[in-house]
């Protein structure tokens, strides 16, 4: 049972519109702190070059594979920033997050605890809910910044596409 900070696993079920995301593939670079930081630097530079209001930026991660099924070295993992849907589709590095119904879970705490939170979602919440995961990818939206937030106060919204059982 996930009990970090006595979290309650009750998602908001909501339909979202498709979103475009400028992405950079991470692969196994997350294991190397410097290379991982360089990816984040590239994303923030991309935002700066576009002269957008940094306070409204929504940074996300996209997981295309389940590490419980796919070997870690084959998992596709991306970091990105949500961009205006009116942007040109053919821009390199732009992916679309599908619209549809999502279960949105809020995790408050250190990112290192997310794997336990996911395990509880899949092992406890889904079996008891009226929903099952859909076969498209899930994503995380980071609601605050690690550079200016205590680890125990980091907020991550986890979006898992769902369909009724």
Specify the residue positions occupied by each region the protein language model found.
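A solvent-exposed interaction/effector surface
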Residues: 1-165
């Amino acid at each position: 049972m996930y009990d970090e900070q006595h979290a309650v696993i009750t998602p908001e079920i909501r339909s979202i519109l498709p979103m475009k995301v400028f992405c950079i593939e991470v692969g196994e670079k997350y294991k190397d702190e410097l290379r991982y930081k360089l990816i984040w630097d590239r994303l923030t530079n991309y935002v700066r070059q576009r002269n957008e209001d940094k306070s409204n930026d929504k940074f996300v991660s996209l997981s295309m594979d389940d590490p419980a099924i796919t070997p870690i070295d084959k998992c596709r993992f991306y970091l990105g920033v949500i961009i205006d849907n009116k942007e040109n589709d053919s821009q390199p590095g732009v992916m679309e997050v599908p619209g549809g119904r999502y279960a949105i879970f809020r995790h408050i705490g250190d990112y290192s605890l997310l794997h336990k939170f996911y395990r509880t979602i899949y092992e406890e919440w889904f079996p008891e809910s009226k929903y099952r995961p859909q076969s498209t990818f899930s994503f995380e939206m980071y609601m605050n910044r690690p550079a200016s937030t205590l680890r125990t106060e980091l907020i991550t919204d986890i979006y898992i596409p769902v369909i009724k059982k």
